[in-house]
A protein has these predicted regions:
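Feature captures the catalytic cores and cofactor-binding loops of soluble hydro-lyases/lyases
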Residues: 21-23, 33-47, 51-93
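Conserved catalytic and cofactor-binding micro-motifs
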Residues: 1-41
Length: 93
């Protein structure tokens, strides 16, 4: 499924509008708040669901080549996180 299609179906707000989500594919989602768990278990093209908001989530997302990150519980990403997300083409919702 295309990430843009998923965004529309789930009514997700893209927090960093500088990334292009029209061509990104999502094959599955993974929910975890432990970075070590995500590194060990998430796969490429997955969508990561978490409450974490610090810049290290972008490093993990880039390392694992994931499609994007959904922040839960009305969590706002740190400005540095969104800046790094734009630099690394990682959508944050």
């Amino acid at each position: 499924m295309k990430l843009k299609e998923l965004q529309e179906k789930l009514n997700l707000q893209l927090l960093n509008n500088e990334v292009d989500i029209t061509s990104k594919e999502v094959s599955w989602a993974y929910c975890s708040d432990l970075l070590s768990d995500v590194i060990a278990n998430i796969e490429a093209n997955y969508l990561w669901i978490t409450i974490q908001k610090h810049p290290n989530i972008i490093a993990v997302a880039t390392l694992k080549d994931i499609s994007g990150i959904i922040l839960t519980n009305n969590t706002d990403a740190d400005p540095e996180t969104l800046s790094k997300a734009n630099e690394n083409d990682i959508p944050v919702f």
